[in-house]
Amino acid sequence: MGRTTSSPKAMMRIATVAAILTILASTCMARNVLTNGEGLYAGQSLDVEQYKFIMQDDCNLVLYEYSTPIWASNTGVTGKNGCRAVMQRDGNFVVYDVNGRPVWASNSVRGNGNYILVLQKDRNVVIYGSDIWSTGTYRRSVGGAVVMAMNGTVDGGSVIGPVVVNQNVTAAIRKVGTGAA
């Protein structure tokens, strides 16, 4: 068999897909994620533990901790049932009124790509997506997940072997072409 090689760009795509799958796998019991093109219509919500991110019937997008509102889009209009909030393919999260006009946006347009909006257990709502550009020299942890740099390292160490990617999931990243963990 021929030797398999992989570019840093391909490895980054694999790492991005693995991170997204990890986030999605940890949400099997509760719906707390929107992916490209998905949205919340009046009465629908994302939920995790005591937090609820809901598109209300009045067109106001609100984040609740238990029954206390802690953030709102301030787009509420009495009697305007039919609004929706959409995670767009360009990275922007937008609230549209009943006539399809944008009334609020996250202003996070980054170009077409793979984006997810996550209601996290730390009461934060975050949009994650493809990096636009990177030197590949960073090392950081995001929301309890290990982030792999383009050079194949995490916190200065090799990622070959078991890597804890969040509090509940362990993943083994394999070197391409060897079959070994």
Swiss-Prot record:
UniProt GO MF annotations: D-mannose binding; protein homodimerization activity
SUPFAM superfamilies noted in UniProt: alpha-D-mannose-specific plant lectins
Alphabetical GO biological process terms: cell-cell adhesion; defense response to insect; defense response to virus; regulation of defense response to virus
InterPro entries assigned to the protein according to its UniProt record, in alphabetical order: Bulb-type_lectin_dom, Bulb-type_lectin_dom_sf
CDD domains assigned: B_lectin
Highest taxon, organism lineage: Eukaryota
Keywords assigned by UniProt, alphabetized: Antiviral protein, Disulfide bond, Lectin, Mannose-binding, Plant defense, Secreted, Signal
Further details from the record: Has an inhibitory effect on SARS-CoV-2 in Vero E6 cells (IC(50)=4 ug/ml). Viral replication is inhibited by 80% at a concentration of 20 ug/ml, and 50% inhibition is observed at concentrations of 5 ug/ml and 10 ug/ml.
Quaternary structure, from the entry: Homodimer.
Full protein name: Mannose-specific lectin
Species in which this protein is naturally found: Allium sativum (Garlic)
